[in-house]
């Protein structure tokens, strides 16, 4: 999982 996907704007999974 990633904080935030730059290419696909979506809700962050784990911060």
Curated annotation (Swiss-Prot):
GO MF annotation list: calcium channel regulator activity; toxin activity
GO (cellular component) term, any one: extracellular region
Cell compartment(s), UniProt: Secreted
Keyword Metal-binding: no
Key words, A-Z: Calcium channel impairing toxin, Disulfide bond, Ion channel impairing toxin, Neurotoxin, Secreted, Toxin
Family: Belongs to the CRISP family.
Function: Weakly blocks contraction of smooth muscle elicited by high potassium-induced depolarization, but does not block caffeine-stimulated contraction. May target voltage-gated calcium channels on smooth muscle.
Protein name per the record: Cysteine-rich venom protein Bco13
Species per Swiss-Prot/TrEMBL record: Bothrops cotiara
């Amino acid at each position: 999982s990633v904080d935030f996907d730059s290419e696909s704007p979506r809700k962050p999974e784990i911060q």
